[in-house]
Amino acid sequence: SLSHGEGKNAFYALGSGPARALATKVKDGNEEPVEELYKELGYRDHSNETAIVMEVDKVPPVEVIEKIAKACKVDASGVHVILTPTSSLAGGMQVVGRVLEVALHKAHSLHFPLGNIIDGTGTAPVPPPHPNFVKA
């Protein structure tokens, strides 16, 4: 998750996209992926720019963009942000579009050998936009 500040001015969003594959942290003197899954899979990505999709209805503060840039080792001008409020059609599509990703993550968490999965598909209903993000 991406967060900054407290109280009424607090910012919080879930993020997805290429930035998650680029983001690293230093732990015990070693650089490693922020995402545990990428660490387990031994996957690393490198780029001069990145993109992130945020499930949120307001523009993130500069501090959040700087945090993403630092973790991804890119200049802040190379961070491309797409905002998809959950209450919008784009937000609903973004959530529904991850149905296969969630299934594969579940298979991984159950220690099913992912190399045995050759192909996959998923379907889910697309909810209509709703002004209340909880109901959306």
From Swiss-Prot:
It holds the Pfam family MCH. Its EC number is 3.5.4.27. It comes from the Bacteria. One of its GO terms (biological process) is one-carbon metabolic process. Pathway: One-carbon metabolism; formaldehyde degradation; formate from formaldehyde (H(4)MPT route): step 3/5. GO terms for molecular function: methenyltetrahydromethanopterin cyclohydrolase activity. One of its GO terms (cellular component) is cytoplasm. Keywords: Cytoplasm, Hydrolase, One-carbon metabolism. It catalyses: 5,10-methenyl-5,6,7,8-tetrahydromethanopterin + H2O = N(5)-formyl-5,6,7,8-tetrahydromethanopterin + H(+). SUPFAM superfamilies: Methenyltetrahydromethanopterin cyclohydrolase (SSF56199). It is found in: Cytoplasm. Belongs to the MCH family. Catalyzes the hydrolysis of methenyl-H(4)MPT(+) to 5-formyl-H(4)MPT. This is Methenyltetrahydromethanopterin cyclohydrolase. It comes from Methylococcus thermophilus.
